[in-house]
A protein has these predicted regions:
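Bacterial N-terminal signal peptides
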Residues: 22-33
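Axial heme c-ligation environment in periplasmic c-type cytochrome domains
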Residues: 59-64, 80-124, 159-164, 182-215
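Electrostatic cytochrome c docking/interface patches
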Residues: 31-45, 55-61, 115-141, 163
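The feature marks the first
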Residues: 45-83
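Short cysteine/histidine-rich metal-coordination sites, predominantly Zn2+-binding motifs
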Residues: 64-71, 151, 164-171
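Positively charged n-region of N-terminal signal peptides that target proteins for export
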Residues: 2, 18-22
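The canonical Cys-X-X-Cys-His
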Residues: 47-54, 109, 145-155, 207
Length: 215
């Protein structure tokens, strides 16, 4: 039989993505300072879609940006530039990509992406949704873990610099909770490292599943 195997196609796709990332970093470096960022046709927006997908709906391992809170997006871009957001994916991809963004460009990008329509990933385990909902809404008093709803809102919509979690991809939510528990972002001053470190893998899976379905 002839043709390209799925494995080879996957490797080729990976190479294409990495090349795109490198080109994006170069383009941002040369263009971000002189081009309005908050526009659908701006180089900065187009570069973001290399990893975050068309319409910024997310593309593994990059999260959905569409509909995310602008204050959160802006603070995270600042965290990438200062290296405060220090997990492996941030170091590999976003430290370089955000390095040359001005504060104004970061603000414009955050406003632009926050205004885009979003759709829930809906890719979690439906059998875990009920358990995840209970953890989100009630917390785990026996482990001194406050309910997620207290900070992230009844529909996981977030507030201010607290992110919207509703509808994000299962894999992103799971990985982020695991990284919080592993001690990343300790210098952010956020309570999540302590909270996530008390969650078991099964509890993380349940939470991520529940959140992935929220519209």
């Amino acid at each position: 039989m002839s043709g390209i195997s799925p494995l080879t196609k996957g490797k080729q796709r990976g190479i294409q993505v990495m090349m795109g990332i490198r080109l994006a970093i170069l383009a941002i470096s040369f263009l971000a300072a002189s081009t309005p960022a908050g526009h659908a046709e701006s180089p900065a927006v187009r570069n973001c879609t290399w990893c975050h997908g068309t319409g910024a709906q997310g593309y593994t391992p990059a999260p959905r940006l569409a509909g995310q809170r602008s204050q959160y997006l802006e603070s995270q871009l600042a965290g990438f530039r200062s290296h405060a957001r220090d997990n492996p994916f941030s170091k590999q991809y976003m430290w370089g990509a955000a390095a040359s963004l001005s504060a104004q460009s970061a603000h414009e990008l955050a406003i632009y992406f926050s205004a885009l329509p979003s759709r829930p990933a809906g890719d979690g385990d439906t059998e875990l949704v009920a358990t995840g909902r209970t953890i989100y809404q009630q917390g785990m008093p026996e482990d001194n873990i406050v309910a997620c709803v207290v900070c992230h809102g009844p529909n996981a919509e977030g507030v201010g610099q607290i992110p919207r979690l509703g509808g994000l991809a299962y894999s992103y939510l799971q990985r982020t909770l695991e990284q919080w528990g592993q001690g990343y972002h300790l210098n952010s001053g956020a309570p999540m490292p302590d909270i996530a470190s008390k969650l078991s893998p099964d509890q993380i899976a349940a939470l991520a599943s529940y959140l992935s379905f929220i519209k």
